[in-house]
Amino acid sequence: MKKVRITAVRKASYPDLMALYENPMENACSVEEGAVFIANGWEKPEGLCDSAWQSMSAFVLTLACGGEDIYSGWMKNRHSAMISCNDGFRPVSFLLEAMEEEAEL
């Protein structure tokens, strides 16, 4: 089983939707663009929010176990995936990449 690099590549924000629908939040997403997390096999990396992990964990496990070409030709790199978290007000897009390094399980 391989490690998987998780990179926050884009963070969006929709203040108009927040104003219309969201109750104010004190501790909204703290992930910044460029942040890198390393998943050790199927284990959630420290510092990655639970909601983002729920969105990507199946893809991380697939890549960690050697899966490739998710959705038949979707990604240029067959050992990667682009996933966003479930936050509709401030979604973060994450690039997942299988690493050559073996997970330490």
Per-region residue spans from a language model:
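Intrinsic-disorder/low-complexity, polar/charged segments enriched in Ser/Thr/Lys/Arg/Asp/Glu/Gln
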Residues: 3, 36-38, 91-93
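Short, compact, well-ordered microdomains
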Residues: 56-105
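Helix-coil modules at protein/domain termini and other flexible surface or pore-lining loops
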Residues: 4, 29, 83-86
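A short, structured loop/turn motif at beta-sheet edges
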Residues: 1-3, 30-33, 100-101
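Short, charged beta-turn/beta-strand-edge "cap" motif at the junction between a beta-strand
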Residues: 12-13, 41-47
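A structural detector for beta-sheet-dominated domains
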Residues: 7-9, 40, 97-99
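Short, structured beta-strand/loop micro-motifs enriched in basic residues and often containing a Trp
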Residues: 2, 8, 13-22
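Short, flexible N-terminal segments of the mature chain
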Residues: 19-44
